[in-house]
Amino acid sequence: MLLSVAMGLVACGDDSSSSAAVEESSSSEPVQSSSSWTLSSSESRVTDSLSSSSVDTSRVNSSSSLTGTSSSQAGEPGDTTRITYALKRFDGPLTNPHKGFTVPTEAAWTFDPGFEYGPHGSLNNGAWNLVTYGSGYQQWNKLNPAKGVYDWSELEELLDALTAHNMGYALRVFPYSPSFIRDSNTPEENYDWTPKYVYEVGAKKITARYKDNNANAAVPVWDDSVYLYYAKEFATALAAKYDGDPRIEYIDVRSFGEWGEWHVSNLDGSKMPSVEIQKDMLKHYASVFKKSLLVLPSDGYGDVYTYALSLGITKRDDCLIGIPGTADSLVRAYEANMPTVAENCGGYAIMLNYTDMIPGGYLKWTPERWVDAITTAHLTYYVLDQDFDDCGYRFYNDNKELADSMTKVLGYNFTVESAELVTVAGAKDTTSTLNITVKNTGVAPCFFDIYMVAEFVDSTGRALAQVGETVRIPKGTFKDDSSQNFSFTYKVASGKPDVAKQSGVSVSLSLYESEDAFKGGKNPTVRFDNDGLQGNNKLLLKP
C-alpha cells in the first residue's frame, strides 16, 4: 500500500525550456539527421528543432540484442512502417546522479572491509545500494591548522574513496560542535574547532553554559571582526580548492553557531551575529563560489533565507518529521527552482521512541510521515538515516520496500512513457523518425544539464549510427510531473546503405551529463526508469 502511495505523490511545476544545436562528426555515408522536442504542460508548449547532416558512429559495449517488429500503414506517403515499443517501469531501486539518499561517511575507512556496516562490510548492508553521495563533517581547525596553511589530505582521501564508488560528497566544515562537551574540564579543542591561530591574532571568545549538561564551555564571539575575517579567508581558500569540483555535490555555509547550523540554542550566553553580518557572510561565499551549489543551514530563516535565495544559495532543514511544518519551510527554495536538502531531527532508532508530544517533544518516525516529508519539501537530497553507527542498516532492514520505491520519487525520475519508430521509404530517400514521450515522475526538476541521445544498435548493443541530434535539456527546465515529447530523425538517400534496415538492429536511448562524455565514447550516467536498461546504462527499446 505504501509503495503505491509513494509512487503516486508527485508535485506539479511550471515549464520552460531552451535547446541548443549540437554538432556531431560526419560519417562516411551521407545521411541527414535532426531532432526536436516539445514541452508538454498545462501552461506552455515549446518546440525547438535541431538539424544537421551528420551522424555519430561511436561504439559501446553491451550484450543485449533485439529485433523490432513492424506494421505497414496504408494511405501514408511512401512505404511506411511503424514499430511501437512496449514500455514498463524498472523493477527495483533506481539511483541517479546529483540527487538521492546519503548516510554518514566520516572518512575513507567507511569503505574498509573491516567496517561491518560499510559497503564492503560483513553485514552486506543493503542501504548502500540506495546511497548516491556521502555526507559528514570536517573540522575547520584540521583543514586550516595555521594561518595560511591548509591540509586537505584526509578530505582528499575520502573524496577519492567516494569517487571510486560512484558517489559525490556533501561538504560541511564545522567551527564548533557541542556534542563533545563532556563537562567543564573538557579541552576546548575537543569541541571548539575554530583554529587556535584565529584567537592568537585577536579573536575573542566567551564562556557559555552548555544546557545539555550545565558544563561551562568556551565559545567564539560570532560577530568578532577578527573571527569574521578569518572565516571569510577560509571560505576563499575552500573555494579556490573545491569550487566546481565534480566530486562535491554541495557545500554548506557553516560559519556560525553549534555545528555551524546558525543557532546557539544550547549555549546559554552565546549570541548569533546580526542579520546583516549573516547576509554579509552569505554574500562572501557567493562571491568566491561561482560553480558549486551552496546551502544555507537549517536555522537560517526570514530575511536571511530570502537573501540567500537571491544569491542562488538553496536551503536545508535538519529537523524533518520531528517538528511539524519543517518540510514546508523548504518549499520556498523549491519554488525558486533550487534543489532542497534535508535531514531528520535524529537518527531512525531515536525517532522511533519520540513521544508525539507537541509542544514539549517531537513527532516519531512513521512511514507516512517520511513520504510526506519527501513530497512536501520536493526533496532532491535527503539523509536515509543519520545514525553514524550503522549507516542506515537498521532503517533499511525495517523499510526496504518503501525505501527502494522512494529512490524513484526523490529528486528527478525520467520514465519513457511512449516510443514509436516511423520509417517512410520514398523515391528519393528513406526517413526514420523516433517519437518518444518522457515524463519526470519525481518530485523535483533535474538541476543539471542533461543530453539525450538516440542510436541504432546491432544485436550485440554496439552503436551503429546516431538517430537525429543530441538534445540538450537545460538544468531546471524538466519539471516534476511534466512530460516532454522528443523526435529524432534519420534520413538516408536512396541507394545508400541504411543501417536501420540491417538484421537485428534496434534503438537505444541514453542520458548523459555532458556532450563530451557521449562524444568521447563514455557510458551514460543517468538512467531511465524503464525495463530494458543495459549494463552500460543505455535503455534498449523493446517492441
Q: What is the predicted function of each stretch?
A:
Residues L3-T80:
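Bacterial Sec-dependent N-terminal signal peptides
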Residues G134, L238, I251, Y285, ...:
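Conserved, mostly hydrophobic/aromatic
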Residues K408-P543:
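Extracellular/luminal regions of secreted and cell-surface proteins that mediate adhesion/ECM remodeling
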